[in-house]
């Protein structure tokens, strides 16, 4: 940990003692800076441009060194707008990479790529900071034991379980419940694992970032009265930011998460929305730096950049960072280099279905499209694996029969198929669950369902023990005992009506 050289105020004396250079060229967000002989900054060093623009406004722009050009010149990428900068302006080499505040002071706050608060709630304690560029943990520090990361969400834990310290891709369009699922995961990791979360908004809409913040305050994930008791830190570098900021905001969020893992020894959830925008920003910067483009116009360093981010997201003997990354697939082309490079790093995929959301089944996780490398008998055990496979087979058969049902009706099916359909409909409804963060608008109390309870519930449905219960008894309940209680309640209500 070190004092943060980039967080100093424009007149701070600590910056005045550093090496000084001058701007010699400005091309959009890219600056060429000349330094005296023997005073060249290192790659990834933070440079600060200070001065006044043509109308006398104070300028304070932080840049990051990307290339050494020769002739005592460096090329740097700006982390904020370069409006008002001029050739000949003074540039200060801070002598260190960008550093951002870390630790408990970050919880409940919103930061930009430089680790500066942007939520108008006053300054943040930045005595403890950490550089955003680091090496991944050494092999000897890694925790190689494969273990399930229990989320308390039935459909995820049973059919596409998350790996502790793994990376999960979240696929889903607008309005299918991505934000609510993210908030529920943040809530559950705090309650069940004593962990915290870091949300990195990378190149997405500012409106969505604002909506997420407001919903987090409403649901209690961010505690307005006692900010330190919040469960999440937010880091935003949205669509309106220059490409340099969008390219580095993921690393800022990851650096905050690493501190919770390595120093506080906590389990951390790191959300990146959207990992594609990280690649897109890298592509823009690559073109501005004059590199030859690679396949489909992407940067030639695509795999290296993705690897340098993803390899830092892992489990160590101290704690874990489990990452959930929203993946935008351009033109639905899964072979596009950006999503294809991302897939190589993922351990599981959670696919949200518009069809299920339209039926009112939330979370709208598609049980057949969602996958996980953890769903193997040697990892999850034979019972879990067999129940998950039988659930998938039942739902798959129901899917195959839907066309016949639509044309001919249920009566034309065989006895066996009718039983399969009845159980599949119960399973489909039992995969729904009331969320803690959705209590505000559903009126139902949230439920955390342990993995053993989830397996027991689906085993009982598949074994036929609940063939006599109505399917609506399984909708929006926690464990199977709640479903039987709901069935009795429904029966009483129908008897009273008679």
Curated annotation (Swiss-Prot):
Coiled coil: none annotated. Its EC number is 7.1.2.2. One of its GO terms (cellular component) is chloroplast thylakoid membrane. ATP binds at residues 172-179. It is found in: Plastid, Chloroplast thylakoid membrane. It catalyses: ATP + H2O + 4 H(+)(in) = ADP + phosphate + 5 H(+)(out). One of its GO terms (molecular function) is proton-transporting ATP synthase activity, rotational mechanism. CDD domains: ATP-synt_F1_beta_C, ATP-synt_F1_beta_N, F1-ATPase_beta_CD. It is an enzyme of class 7 (translocase). Its main location: plastid. It is a peripheral membrane protein. PANTHER family: ATP SYNTHASE, ATP SYNTHASE SUBUNIT BETA, MITOCHONDRIAL. Produces ATP from ADP in the presence of a proton gradient across the membrane. The catalytic sites are hosted primarily by the beta subunits. Belongs to the ATPase alpha/beta chains family. This is ATP synthase subunit beta, chloroplastic. It comes from Pelargonium hortorum. The lineage of its organism: Eukaryota, Viridiplantae, Streptophyta, Embryophyta, Tracheophyta.
């Amino acid at each position: 940990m070190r004092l943060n050289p980039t967080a100093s105020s424009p007149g701070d004396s600590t910056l005045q003692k550093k090496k000084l250079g001058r701007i010699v060229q400005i091309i959009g967000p890219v600056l060429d800076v000349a330094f005296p002989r023997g005073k060249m900054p290192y790659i990834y060093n933070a440079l600060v441009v200070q001065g006044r623009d043509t109308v006398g406004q104070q300028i304070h722009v932080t840049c990051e060194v990307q290339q050494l050009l020769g002739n005592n010149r460096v090329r740097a990428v700006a982390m904020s707008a370069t409006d008002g900068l001029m050739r000949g302006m003074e540039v200060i080499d801070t002598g260190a990479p960008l550093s951002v505040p870390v630790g408990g002071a970050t919880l409940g706050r919103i930061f930009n790529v430089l680790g500066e608060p942007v939520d108008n709630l006053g300054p943040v304690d930045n005595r403890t900071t950490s550089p955003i560029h680091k090496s991944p943990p050494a092999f000897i520090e890694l925790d190689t034991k494969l273990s399930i990361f229990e989320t308390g969400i039935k459909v995820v834990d049973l059919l596409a379980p998350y790996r502790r310290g793994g990376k999960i891709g979240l696929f889903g369009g607008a309005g299918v419940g991505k934000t609510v699922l993210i908030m529920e995961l943040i809530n559950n990791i705090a309650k069940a694992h004593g962990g915290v979360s870091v949300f990195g908004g990378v190149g997405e809409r500012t409106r969505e970032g604002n909506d997420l913040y407001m919903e987090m305050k409403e649901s209690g994930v961010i505690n307005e009265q006692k900010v330190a008791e919040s469960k999440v830190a937010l880091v935003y570098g949205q669509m309106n930011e220059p490409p340099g900021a969008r390219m580095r905001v993921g690393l800022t969020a990851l650096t905050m998460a690493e501190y919770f893992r390595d120093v506080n020894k906590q389990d951390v959830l790191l959300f990146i929305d959207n990992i594609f925008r990280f690649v897109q920003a890298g592509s823009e910067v690559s073109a501005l730096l004059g590199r030859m483009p690679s396949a489909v116009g992407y940067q030639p360093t695509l795999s290296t950049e993705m690897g340098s981010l993803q390899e830092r997201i892992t489990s160590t003997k101290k704690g874990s960072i489990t990452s959930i990354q929203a993946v935008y697939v351009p033109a639905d082309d899964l072979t596009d280099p950006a999503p294809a490079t991302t897939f190589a790093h993922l351990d599981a995929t959670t696919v949200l279905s518009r069809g299920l959301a339209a039926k009112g089944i939330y979370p709208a996780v598609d049980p057949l499209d969602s996958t996980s490398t953890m769903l193997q008998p040697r990892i999850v055990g034979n019972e879990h694996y067999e129940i998950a496979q039988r659930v998938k087979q039942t739902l798959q058969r129901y899917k195959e029969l839907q066309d016949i049902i639509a044309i001919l009706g249920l009566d034309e099916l065989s006895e066996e198929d009718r039983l399969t359909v009845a159980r599949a409909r119960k399973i489909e409804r039992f995969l729904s669950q009331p969320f803690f963060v959705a209590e505000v608008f559903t009126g139902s109390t949230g439920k955390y369902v342990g993995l053993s309870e989830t397996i027991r519930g689906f085993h009982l449905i598949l074994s036929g023990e609940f063939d006599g219960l109505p399917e609506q008894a399984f909708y929006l309940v926690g464990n199977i005992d709640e479903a039987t209680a709901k069935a009795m309640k429904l029966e009483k209500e129908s008897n009273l009506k008679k």
